[in-house]
């Protein structure tokens, strides 16, 4: 069956949720307590070891194959307008996000700011911190980075919704 990356990731989430729920259910039912004199069979939870292990192994195999298919797709599919693979884009977007955050902090500074504390304590000495960069250049770089980040995210969203790959469950 053909899946887009977005569909495959939704399926992966569903499989992981089912796997976690089954593990949790197994943990709650694989052993149990009974009071002295209580009929053990009346409080025994339903649990089939062989059936549970078989389903867990089946889910593990499907999850493994699906992750591999997604990884293969991500390392070979090129993102339009960028000339890099999805895999590279998944590294590039956090880099842009980090750069944007740094530039936001830099562009928010005043050229000269009074320092209120020194070494975590109030000081009677008047001290100033000065920016050592061109604020206009930082603001320009911030706008370019924010635009590039938006463009990258939209391009990645497009390829994840449009292009598909084959995966057999």
Language model regions located:
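Structural preference for solvent-exposed beta-strand-turn elements
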Residues: 1-169
């Amino acid at each position: 069956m053909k899946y887009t990356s977005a569909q495959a990731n939704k399926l992966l989430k569903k499989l992981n949720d089912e796997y976690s729920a089954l593990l949790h259910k197994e943990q709650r039912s694989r052993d149990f307590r009974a009071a002295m004199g209580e009929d053990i069979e009346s409080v025994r939870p339903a649990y089939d070891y062989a059936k549970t292990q078989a389903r867990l192994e089946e889910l593990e195999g499907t999850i493994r194959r699906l992750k591999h298919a997604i990884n293969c797709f991500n390392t070979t599919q090129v993102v339009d307008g960028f000339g890099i693979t999805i895999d590279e884009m998944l590294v590039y977007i956090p880099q842009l996000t980090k750069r944007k955050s740094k530039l936001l902090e830099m562009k928010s500074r005043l050229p000269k700011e009074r320092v209120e504390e020194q070494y975590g304590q109030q000081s009677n000495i008047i001290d100033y911190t000065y920016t050592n960069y061109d604020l206009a250049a930082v603001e320009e770089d911030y706008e370019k980075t924010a635009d590039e980040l938006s463009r990258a995210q939209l391009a990645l969203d497009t390829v994840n919704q449009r292009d598909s790959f084959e995966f057999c469950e």
